[in-house]
Amino acid sequence: MPDQALQQMLDRSCWVCFATDEDDRTAEWVRPCRCRGSTKWVHQACLQRWVDEKQRGNSTARVACPQCNAEYLIVFPKLGPVVYVLDLADRLISKACPFAAAGIMVGSIYWTAVTYGAVTVMQVVGHKEGLDVMERADPLFLLIGLPTIPVMLILGKMIRWEDYVLRLWRKYSNKLQILNSIFPGIGCPVPRIPAEANPLADHVSATRILCGALVFPTIATIVGKLMFSSVNSNLQRTILGGIAFVAIKGAFKVYFKQQQYLRQAHRKILNYPEQEEA
Amino acid sequence: MPDQALQQMLDRSCWVCFATDEDDRTAEWVRPCRCRGSTKWVHQACLQRWVDEKQRGNSTARVACPQCNAEYLIVFPKLGPVVYVLDLADRLISKACPFAAAGIMVGSIYWTAVTYGAVTVMQVVGHKEGLDVMERADPLFLLIGLPTIPVMLILGKMIRWEDYVLRLWRKYSNKLQILNSIFPGIGCPVPRIPAEANPLADHVSATRILCGALVFPTIATIVGKLMFSSVNSNLQRTILGGIAFVAIKGAFKVYFKQQQYLRQAHRKILNYPEQEEA
């Protein structure tokens, strides 16, 4: 070994703890990167701690010398076959579990939809008849058909036919003079066109659609019993109740929105009170 | 009206469209705030549009004069009783729906937990016996008892007894020389204490707990059938299978974590290859 390299070896010092050979003869040294001079040598133990800090618990993270940017060559003892298999299984489970958990959530919502569908069938057609229908039906048809009930209700609820009726109403309102007698002020022109009202915050309108759709069969059954008690068939009575409810609610909604529209249109901004000026 | 005020009225101009009285004799004027001079007067119609813009669809938002900061006095036609009731109902529904939707979600998870509990009872105790037990049980007890099954499984899964065993192992490993023969290298001291490994990302560990807990009864049943087929009682067989599975899995896990620990402890950082230096 040339004298110069030997000399360098003898007066090396660790760039982590600054100790030299005299301070600790037994310590193991390593030159992990391309650096020369005072940052060439470092204790193996000191460097390990330094790398631990840099990795912050992620033992597979790569670490490089902050000065010459050379990546440290970190090697581990070979994995035994058992540990290799366990490691593989561990990583597979970690990868699969988020998807399995998502599957559980979807399964939970699906199962609730099936149950809701079954309850709705019994509610609309009648308890006993509903059970008979479902017992006779093909299980596969049930597992697909029942959850479509809430889906259909939600999609149906998303159809905003009232807004369509409102647009027609405003478009042809001046031709609707005859309606003026029933709904006063229905046909007269508005002094100004108010700004389009903000639609409800997304989450509120989404929850309104969900709740409105899921409670609809119950309301249809109640309205059916109240208004069409003379109709014997549960199904027909509930369907009539549903149609009546949609129509009545729609009429109220159209009227309400039109009144809000008119209210906005007839909004007034007053003069600032005189006396406050003096 | 004093001459000066009259004169001001005559040469007023709208600070939105800059039109004066001559440009539009019929336009309605308003002085909505404390401003004087050229920004005192404005057309009612122009100010309405300006306010619409400021409100961006939120018709109840308050608007103030950008200069004197006086709030505009915006008044609406009085609400009719029907519209008042409809408005009230509309706002109530908007407030209640988010909570109702949250209730539906919780109900969905609860209902899935009840179903999972029932399926697990039938799986562990046996299909027919499970049904008998549940038919004889008090419905209220079922509606509370069944969902606690998945809850108990999840809580049980969160007990990390393997880590406790590991800590004991590392604490008294040097006294465990006798184990050295079974698990080579189990007792010998480690060259360094590796950094604590990062726990799994929260969502991964949460999903692992959820999936591990919910799949446990199925695994316990299978292990029970494989290892304790001589045991007649379904329940006992499944319990034995569960205990065996937990013990075996725990042993593997402790061994695996200890091997990872040792692997980290015997990690080495090599010298940077010489030839690359020249």
From Swiss-Prot, chains A, B:
Pathway: Protein modification; protein ubiquitination. It comes from the Eukaryota. The chain crosses the membrane at residues 99-119, 139-159, 209-229, 238-258. Changing residue 65 to S: Loss of E3 ubiquitin ligase activity. Formation of highly interconnected mitochondria and perinuclear accumulation. Expressed in brain, heart, liver, lung, spleen, stomach, testis, skeletal and muscle. GO terms for molecular function: GTPase binding; ubiquitin protein ligase activity; zinc ion binding. It catalyses: S-ubiquitinyl-[E2 ubiquitin-conjugating enzyme]-L-cysteine + [acceptor protein]-L-lysine = [E2 ubiquitin-conjugating enzyme]-L-cysteine + N(6)-ubiquitinyl-[acceptor protein]-L-lysine. Its EC number is 2.3.2.27. A zinc finger (RING-CH-type) spans 6-75. PANTHER family: E3 UBIQUITIN-PROTEIN LIGASE MARCH5. This is E3 ubiquitin-protein ligase MARCHF5. It comes from Homo sapiens (Human). The gene is MARCHF5.
